[in-house]
């Protein structure tokens, strides 16, 4: 092969890798969409508590946390997906969510969470 053909093959392979990575990323983002929609909707009932406006979570908050637990238990990958949605939602939220309120949420809602929420989540380990 001459150098022109070799360069063309190398560029084609590189382009194929870039497209492959982009496609994988789009599939991953697409898989978050339904989970994040539920997460944002259901978690919105808890924001007044999580940001410190209320001293305890409301009944609607706790009901929706139970619903998120059901979603988390439905498939093996759901806890990680929900964790990523919560992480994306809380990152940069103003006013910030209070770490102690996040930790109190399962206890005050009389439930055990099937997905992690904390101020220092690492969803890659879920």
UniProtKB/Swiss-Prot annotation:
GO molecular function: lipid binding
Keywords annotated in UniProt: Disulfide bond, Lipid-binding, Signal, Transport
Function: Plant non-specific lipid-transfer proteins transfer phospholipids as well as galactolipids across membranes. May play a role in wax or cutin deposition in the cell walls of expanding epidermal cells and certain secretory tissues.
Organism name: Arabidopsis thaliana (Mouse-ear cress)
Protein name: Non-specific lipid-transfer protein 13
Oxidoreductase keyword on record: no
Signal peptide (residue range): 1-20
S-S pairs: 36-85, 46-61, 62-109, 83-123
């Amino acid at each position: 092969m001459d150098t022109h053909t070799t360069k063309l093959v190398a560029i084609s392979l590189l382009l194929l890798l870039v497209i492959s990575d982009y496609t994988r990323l789009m599939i991953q983002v697409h898989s978050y969409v339904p989970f994040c929609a539920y997460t944002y909707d259901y978690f919105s009932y808890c924001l007044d508590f999580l940001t410190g406006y209320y001293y305890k979570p409301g009944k609607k908050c706790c009901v929706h946390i139970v619903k998120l637990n059901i979603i988390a238990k439905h498939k093996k990958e759901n806890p990680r997906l929900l964790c990523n949605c919560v992480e994306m939602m809380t990152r940069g939220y103003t006013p910030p969510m209070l770490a102690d309120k996040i930790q109190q949420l399962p206890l005050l809602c009389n439930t055990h969470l099937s997905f992690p929420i904390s101020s220092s989540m690492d969803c890659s380990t879920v």
